[in-house]
Curated annotation (Swiss-Prot):
It is found in: Cell inner membrane. The record marks 372 as: Required for activity. It catalyses: ATP + H2O + 4 H(+)(in) = ADP + phosphate + 5 H(+)(out). The lineage of its organism: Bacteria, Pseudomonadati, Pseudomonadota, Alphaproteobacteria, Rhodobacterales. It holds the Pfam family ATP-synt_ab_C. This is ATP synthase subunit alpha. CDD domains: ATP-synt_F1_alpha_C (cd18113), ATP-synt_F1_alpha_N (cd18116), F1-ATPase_alpha_CD (cd01132). GO terms for molecular function: ADP binding; ATP binding; proton-transporting ATP synthase activity, rotational mechanism. It comes from Fuscovulum blasticum (Rhodobacter blasticus). NCBIfam families: atpA, PRK13343.1.
Length: 512
């Protein structure tokens, strides 16, 4: 069967008609050298600082050093698959990550890719990872409490929604435990809020440079307690390249800002920023940027300040949302005057200082109440907590002062002895096991008992037993009181004080 000439011409005409005149233009460069996660690229004349570029095989990188004759690019992945002479394409986009409700309950890497094996992420939008912090006009003073469920923190170092409170201490002093308990504590409040988004608090936990097993344990705990429903975990583990560890906090913050900008509340936990600074130092030195103090680059302060300034309380015209930050810093042998610790202390609105000495004495959470402060103060406390917490802080401060002197003298007058006895019991009362956060009303009742002499006759070793018994009593027979305190926040005075005293008297009578 022969093909007719007319058919051939028709086919040719069809082909010509469908010929695309649009040529795809891609700006490309060539790899000059690659190693240690850094690629030097010739070309890419119009690349922006912080722009994503693409290597063969889909490996991504970010342009950081724009020099006269080459571009320094950090690689988000394994550099073993990249070789000299490879072409590098511009993507014309700054690093961005998925954001939205679809990320809740998921574990993602620093680029927002899922790493939990639960399938693709359904994101409602994409957000640029490193954006400018809100200005002065959209902000409002911090005035709503962000309950951690820890007696020592909520009573003496209150944290408000929109605050940045640093958790600082040596390794193995319970820094992550404080942050994790704070996440677990939100479950009660989120469940009680129902559909009221203005009361809920969503959590974003950023793990930087940690072991994968540690992150897996944490996620397992969150899933077991049902806390994963309102939590996103961003993980750049120890086996990930330094650029991923550098980027993870920015990506996590972009995910948290989705809630802040939609009139909701979110909590950011950066665990920990010391490792991000180390990753940034590694990148900077390999890019041949000049080193400064402790070999960190000169802009390591700006690295942390631009990250933490994004946590803010917005005013009503901007949706009244908030982003609270709990950055964690690891110190070496309690040295809080090192470079990174002093930087982050000066950026944040207070710090919770955890001491290994207290930890080994069995005082856990090992909060040093003398060195820990909250620069927001009582404006971030409920009225009930405010009315009982002032006294406990003062009594513990006096106790610490007296305890130092009491070592030298044996003959102490009655008032000093009473102060020491009360202080020892209050110190014991501030202890709290992990994974057992308490509600605001429960903490108020416990501290009221401690500061109003209910423990003075109880032996120090029995304080924990007294507290456990009191909690059981309040959760069963005193449930109406707790519910009333939760619903109607007011000063502990008048009728409320009488009601609390009645419950305490009823319990103390049977306690033996």
């Amino acid at each position: 069967m022969g093909i007719q000439a007319a058919e051939i011409s028709a086919i040719l005409k069809e082909q010509i008609k469908n010929f695309g005149k649009d040529a795809e233009v891609a700006e490309v460069g060539r790899v000059l050298s690659v190693g240690d996660g850094i690629a030097r690229v010739y070309g890419l004349d119009n690349v922006q600082a912080g722009e994503m570029v693409e290597f063969p095989g889909g490996i991504r990188g970010m342009a950081l050093n724009l020099e006269v004759d080459n571009v320094g690019i950090v690689i988000f992945g394994d550099d073993r698959d990249i070789k000299e002479g490879d072409t590098v394409k511009r993507t014309k986009s700054i690093v961005d990550v998925p954001a939205g409700n679809g990320l809740l309950g998921r574990v993602v890497d620093a680029l927002g890719n899922p790493i939990d094996g639960k399938g693709p992420i359904v994101a409602s939008e994409r957000r640029i990872a490193d954006v400018k912090a809100p200005g002065i006009i959209p902000r409002k003073g911090v005035h709503e409490p962000m309950a951690t469920g820890l007696k020592a923190v909520d009573a003496m170092i209150p944290i408000g929604r929109g605050q940045r409170e640093l958790i600082i201490g040596d390794r193995q002093t319970g820094k992550t435990a404080v942050a994790l308990d704070t996440i677990l504590n939100q479950k009660v409040y989120n469940d009680a809020a129902g559909d009221d988004e203005s009361k809920k608090l969503y959590c974003v936990y950023v793990a930087i440079g940690q072991k994968r097993s540690t992150v897996a344990q944490l996620v397992k705990k969150l899933e077991e307690t049902g806390a994963m429903a309102y939590t996103v975990v961003v993980a750049a583990t120890a086996s990930d390249p330094a650029p991923m560890q550098f980027l993870a906090p920015f990506s996590g913050t972009a995910i948290g800002e989705f809630f802040r900008d939609n009139g909701r509340h979110a909590l950011m936990i950066y665990d920990d920023l010391s490792k991000q600074a180390v990753a940034y130092r590694q990148m900077s030195l390999l890019l041949r940027r000049p080193p400064g103090r402790e070999a960190y680059p000169g802009d390591v302060f700006y690295l942390h300040s631009r990250l933490l300034e994004r946590s803010a309380k917005m005013n009503g015209d901007f949706g009244a949302g908030s982003l609270t930050a709990l950055p964690i810093i690891e110190t070496q042998a309690g040295d809080i005057s090192a470079y990174i610790p002093t930087n982050v202390i000066s950026i944040t609105d207070g710090q919770i200082f955890l001491e290994s000495e207290l930890f080994y004495q069995g005082i856990r959470p090992a909060v040093n109440t003398g060195l820990s402060v909250s620069r927001v103060g009582s404006s971030a406390q409920t009225s009930a907590m405010k009315s009982v917490a002032g006294k406990v802080k003062l009594e513990l401060a006096q106790y610490r002062e007296m305890a130092a002197f009491a070592q030298f003298g044996s003959d102490l007058d009655a008032s000093t002895q009473a102060l020491l006895n009360r202080g020892a019991r209050l110190t014991e009362l501030m202890k709290q096991p992990q994974y057992s956060p308490l509600t605001n009303a429960e903490i108020v009742c416990i501290i009221f008992a401690g500061t109003n002499g209910y423990l003075d006759k109880v032996a120090v070793r029995d304080v924990g037993r007294f507290e456990a018994g009191l909690l059981k009593h309040l959760r069963t027979k005193g449930k109406a009181l707790l519910d009333d305190m939760t619903k109607n926040d007011r000063k502990v005075a008048g009728d409320l004080e009488k009601a609390i005293r009645a419950e305490l008297d009823a319990f103390a009578k049977d306690f033996a």
